[in-house]
Amino acid sequence: MGSRTGSREEHSLQFLNLTKMTTTTASNLPWVEKYRPSKLDELVAHEQIVKTLTKFIENRTLPHLLFYGPPGTGKTTTVLAAARQMYSPTKMASMVLELNASDERGIDVVRNTIVNFAQTKGLQAFSTSSNTGTVPFKLVILDEADAMTKDAQNALRRVIEKYTDNVRFCIICNYLASIVPAIQSRCTRFRFAPLDQKLIVPRLEYIVETEQLKMTPDGKDALLIVSKGDMRTVINTLQSTAMSFDTVSENTVYQCIGQPTPKEMKEVVKTLLNDPSKKCMNTIQTKLFENGYALQDVITHLHDFVFTLDIPDEAMSAIITGLGEVEENLSTGCSNETQLAAVVAAFFEAKRLCVKEMKNLEIEDMEF
């Protein structure tokens, strides 16, 4: 009797430990995965693409797909949501093959992994809102396919042709030009544009409310600015800031990502337009580099500010050309100090070009 009681208590303890471990694991999920939409109707953007895919699924006429567009715009999420709508949860693993071509980019992956998966046929029961039937094909999701070699892409083209009866392919990439025309012509193409801010805000506010975070209005604006239409960046930056600070504000967001704030950049632009070259160098080094900011990030923000300046086109061209050359030089490993001097020189050239039309380039009253 005592042995049975002890065994029961031990079993209960194991169950409690398992439950606790499962809860902890779920709470430790990155928010970008925790709040990833699982159904097509949960997506916040690309309404026309969702409607088209839903129609394909309902009619069981899904073609080969080619999703392209900037990172964080919902390409992978969309195809995974479509897969969940086609296949039951217990059969997803056997019916869907997801590969990241940036890790496995050679021809061997096509010849071995993909071909072995495509050779076996399977019938999978699935359900939609209106009917129940079978899907007589598997799904291969090839993410970041623009990293594949040309030989691998040509081999993939032959596999797509050979196994069309058994498999549907979804090719995902950032740059359409990196995909060989032979694959493009065999797929239905969908372009995923950067998300509009008004579509990001409801999802952002939902996460803030669910996680019980404190977020200021300027903090929300900062998240939208740094994301540039990338939902993944919004969520990852929000989580990082929330883990590091009590309040998500403009200062804490920029501090978390290690980039200069708009206020700091405005001071830099004023310095570049009004101060002597030596003072420019000293001021920028003090304000930016001592705070650990990278010159590459400074160039990116300068580019945004330059287009707000009311200066002649010739002067604008001189600045943009100079910044472009600096960015290229930085990518090849040139020193920050030398390239900072080149940035100062570009602004001084712009001032020289417009000195006849504008005696003073003060921007105290300019709004950014």
Swiss-Prot record:
Q: What is its main location?
A: nucleus
Say which species the protein is native to: Caenorhabditis elegans
State the name under which the record lists this protein.
Answer: Probable replication factor C subunit 5
A single GO molecular-function term is:
DNA binding
Q: How does it assemble?
A: Heteropentamer of various rfc subunits that forms a complex (RFC) with PCNA in the presence of ATP.
Question: Known InterPro entries for this protein?
Answer: AAA+_ATPase (IPR003593), ATPase_AAA_core (IPR003959), DNA_pol3_clamp-load_cplx_C (IPR008921), DNA_Rep/Repair_Clamp_Loader (IPR050238), P-loop_NTPase (IPR027417), Rep_factorC_C (IPR013748), RFC_lid (IPR047854)
Q: Which SMART domains match?
A: AAA (SM00382)
Functionally, this protein is described as follows: The elongation of primed DNA templates by DNA polymerase delta and epsilon requires the action of the accessory proteins proliferating cell nuclear antigen (PCNA) and activator 1.
Q: Where along the chain is ATP bound?
A: 69-76
Localization:
Nucleus
GO annotations of cellular component type:
DNA replication factor C complex; nucleus
| GO BP term, pick one | DNA-templated DNA replication
Entry-linked Pfam families: AAA (PF00004), Rep_fac_C (PF08542)
Q: Which spans are transmembrane here?
A: none
Q: Which UniProt keywords apply?
A: ATP-binding, DNA replication, Nucleotide-binding, Nucleus
**Protein family per UniProt:** Belongs to the activator 1 small subunits family.
